[in-house]
Curated annotation (Swiss-Prot):
Protein's name in the database: Pro-Pro endopeptidase
Organism: Paenibacillus alvei (strain ATCC 6344 / DSM 29 / NBRC 3343 / NCIMB 9371 / NCTC 6352)
Cofactor dependency: Zn(2+)
Enzyme Commission number(s) of this protein: 3.4.24.89
Listed SUPFAM superfamilies: Metalloproteases ('zincins'), catalytic domain
Length: 217
């Protein structure tokens, strides 16, 4: 009988202790990013790559799961994105909206195809791009195309684009010119931080409401 009591006590102890070691939501999110993100095989800035992964956590886990189910990979590259085998066809090609700059895809730090490729150390605005955050912006292009069925091309979003894209991006020839770019940048503002979300709400309220409905599901 004493042995039975010990067994019961042990089982109870295990039941109490185990929840303490259950994987938190943060760990689950890291897990899907470990599946999505491909790191360079050679030398690279480990701390910056880790920071990029951490920023990608701002994208809802359900959306990251959907990207993974579509076979998407997010490659963090040490060198030019066109050095990646999947993107070699872009060498020497001028990106849309970059005409007359003298630059090609070899100079651009990020792209979103079936593979999302972003250069390590180029996350911030002004480092070869004008996005709030490079890795989030490029990943959200893939979300738009592959998870949200090109929601940036719907009549509802085009109408919002026509009304509000010029509020912050007038004359930039890029975000204000292409609904896909406006979507990726506006969605970045919505997801990046409380401050950027508040700014989106104040300056582009129709866009904010669209994003709020979109990411509520």
């Amino acid at each position: 009988m004493k042995w039975d009591k010990r067994v019961v006590a042990l089982i109870l102890a295990v039941m109490i202790v185990c929840p303490l070691f259950a994987a938190p939501a943060h760990a689950q999110e890291q897990s899907i990013l470990d599946k999505l993100v491909v790191l360079p095989s050679g030398e690279y800035n480990h701390s910056e790559a880790a920071a990029m992964k951490q920023r990608l956590e701002k994208i809802p886990t359900s959306i990251l799961d959907a990207l993974y189910s579509k076979g998407v990979k997010i490659k963090l590259t040490q060198g030019a994105i066109t050095n990646e085998p999947e993107l070699a066809y872009l060498k020497g090609v001028v990106p849309r909206g970059w005409e007359g700059t003298g630059l090609t895809w070899d100079d651009v730090p990020g792209v979103s195809e079936r593979v999302v490729a972003v250069r390590i150390g180029y996350s911030e605005k002004g480092k070869g791009h004008n996005s709030l955050n490079l890795e989030i912006h490029e990943t959200l292009h893939a979300v738009d195309r592959l998870v949200l069925n090109e929601v940036s091309g719907t009549d509802e979003f085009i109408n919002i684009f026509n009304k509000e894209a010029s509020v912050k991006y007038k004359g930039d020839g890029y975000v204000s010119a292409y609904p896909t770019e406006y979507f990726a940048e506006a969605a970045s503002l919505y997801l990046y931080s409380d401050a950027t979300r508040s700014d989106l709400k104040d300056s582009m309220p129709l866009t904010y409401e669209f994003m709020a409905k979109l990411f509520a599901n």
